[in-house]
Amino acid sequence: MTHALLVAIPIVLAVVAGCSSGSGSATDDDGDGGLSTTSAPEDIVVEAGDFTALADMTPVRGFFVANLRGQVDEAVAVAESPDGGVYPVGTVIQLIPQEAMVKRAPGFDPDSNDWEFFTLDATAEGTTILTRGGSEVVNGFSGLSCASCHSAAEPEFDFVCEDTHGCEPLPVPDDVITSIQLADPRPLR
């Protein structure tokens, strides 16, 4: 079982979340003939302490969603929408405690739809970031870029993989994923 988990964790992590970029700045008619400018959302820099126990996040069909800017409702609405959408900056998506993806501001990494990927060490003391970045983050066991797996997601799902989003199915049974999720050692906040 331990060997299966060691093989399954990196595979699951490489296939997990999603991403999409928003627009830069737009100029809109404000209704009175004048123009107003809206700008891209400010970027967010993630620290190890930003990653919480999965049980502190909102579960959606087997993965977990949070937002570091307090936009949990907006992030969950995108995750639950059958039509997809673009996740707000600061959205955290995790399938298992050892990997995460965080939506960054437009321009962070267009190749990964502006998602930053993380490999994590989750312990009872908290989380340590092992690796982070865009499409260069590689799953240690599969040797594949996290972004390469997520790029198969249909565009409307913002780089988030699920059974109906165009991605290859995970080569790990759901019960193994659930057992990894339930073994998250991080304390609740």
Locate the predicted segments by residue:
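C-terminal motif of bacterial Sec signal peptides marking the signal peptidase cleavage site
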Residues: 15-18
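Generic detector of short alpha-helix boundary/capping microenvironments
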Residues: 6-7, 78, 137
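N-terminal secretory signal peptides
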Residues: 33-86
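Sequence context surrounding c-type heme c attachment/ligation sites in exported
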Residues: 22, 41, 48, 84-189
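Short, low-complexity, disordered segments immediately C-terminal to signal peptides
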Residues: 20-39
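Intrinsically disordered, low-complexity peptide-like regions
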Residues: 1, 26-30, 148
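Bacterial N-terminal signal peptides that target proteins for export
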Residues: 1-9
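Core hydrophobic alpha-helical transmembrane segments of single-pass membrane proteins
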Residues: 11-13
